[in-house]
Amino acid sequence: MDNTSALPTRFNVRAYFILFDDAQDAVLVSDELIFGNAYTKFPGGGVEFGEGPSQTVVREAMEEMKQPIEVTGHFYTTDFYLQSFFHPADQIISIYYSARMIGEQQFTDAQIAFDFKQRIYNEESFRWVKLSTIREDMFHFAADKRVARMLATMVR
């Protein structure tokens, strides 16, 4: 960027989890209504003060899905400049962890994309996507696209 006044003025740290199914051949994605628009992304959210990114994904899984999870490893951290799609004053740093469910599945998984019940603000729907069919164009956000591309290469 040539115009430094256009650069973000703060960092926004986000943490997401790549939750594999029991067979290790599908990952969970989150279809979400954000500001009235539908997006497919990986589950997770913003790191809050006083917590580390791996704690964020555990908290987010409980808040969004009522699902206990265990972080099993680091998967990816953004290694390119990423300006926030929603808040241009923010530069995004996204950290992705691989995870597994603790106990039985507690959330309802949708069979189709954007299976919203009421189409209300911030509604979420979760579904499994086979690694053999995952494509970066399924996702809207640049970091998620990168992770989808990485996941797609795992089955080749």
Q: Where in the sequence are the language-model features?
A:
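A generic structural micro-feature
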Residues: 7-11, 39, 87-93, 118-123
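Short, well-ordered beta-strand micro-motif
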Residues: 19, 98-100, 127-130
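Short, P/G- and charge-enriched loop/turn segments at secondary-structure junctions
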Residues: 1-7, 83-87, 113-116
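A short coil-to-beta-strand element that immediately follows conserved catalytic motifs
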Residues: 68-77
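Conserved Nudix-box catalytic region and its N-terminal flanking loop in Nudix hydrolases
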Residues: 25-64
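Active-site-adjacent beta-strand/loop module that shapes the phosphate/pyrophosphate-binding cleft
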Residues: 82-111
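Acidic, metal-coordinating catalytic segment for phosphate/diphosphate chemistry
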Residues: 1-23
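Nudix hydrolase/Nudix homology domain
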Residues: 37-40, 106-107, 112-156
